């Protein structure tokens, strides 16, 4: 487990530290592009992650400010199909499913099949 943590830290630091290229004479062509506050925040985050790993906690138990915001798919409403009377939907199950899937709401086949029964 120690080797995996070391590899994780190396990968995180190399991918999180962007470098800018400068062609000034007498300077290294690569210099860190992070400000000291950003570097300190990165070190603090890595320290917290390593401490949690050492305690045996899963990585999902991170502090709330370190979690990524969850992306939720917006709910799509289909007024033109959902508000049609049941009698008009019963033009045949296949026709109903076809109209439901092509109404522009982005419903799946299973969702349309459930609505049409």
From Swiss-Prot:
Sorted UniProt keywords: Cleavage on pair of basic residues, Disulfide bond, Neurotoxin, Secreted, Signal, Toxin
Protein's cellular compartments: Secreted
Primary subcellular site in the record, as a coarse category: secreted
Basic and acidic residues: bias regions: 62-80
Region feature (Disordered): 53-86
Propeptide part(s) removed at maturation, as residue ranges: 23-90
Leader sequence residues: 1-22
GO function terms (MF aspect): toxin activity
Tissue specificity annotation: Expressed by the venom duct.
GO cellular component, one term: extracellular region
Disulfide bonds: 96-116, 100-112
KW NADP (keyword) present: no
Note: Negative results: very weakly inhibits potassium channels in PC12 cells. Very weakly and reversibly inhibits Kv1.3/KCNA3 in HEK293 cells (Ki=12.1 uM). Does not inhibit Kv1.1/KCNA1, Kv1.2/KCNA2 and Kv1.3/KCNA3 when expressed in oocytes (tested at 10 uM).
Domain notes per entry: The cysteine framework is XIV (C-C-C-C).
Family listed: Belongs to the conotoxin R superfamily.
Name of the protein: Conotoxin vil14a
Species of origin: Conus villepinii
């Amino acid at each position: 487990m120690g080797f995996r943590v070391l590899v994780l830290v190396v990968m995180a630091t190399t991918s999180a530290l962007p470098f800018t290229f400068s062609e000034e004479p007498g300077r290294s062509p690569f210099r860190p592009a992070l400000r000291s506050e950003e570097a300190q925040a990165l070190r603090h985050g890595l320290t917290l992650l390593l401490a949690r790993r050492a305690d045996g906690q899963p990585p999902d138990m991170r502090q709330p400010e370190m979690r990524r915001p969850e992306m939720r798919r917006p709910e799509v409403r289909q007024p033109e199909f959902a508000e049609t009377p049941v009698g008009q939907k019963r033009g045949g199950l296949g026709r109903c499913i076809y109209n439901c899937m092509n109404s522009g709401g982005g419903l799946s086949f299973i969702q349309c099949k459930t609505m049409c029964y």
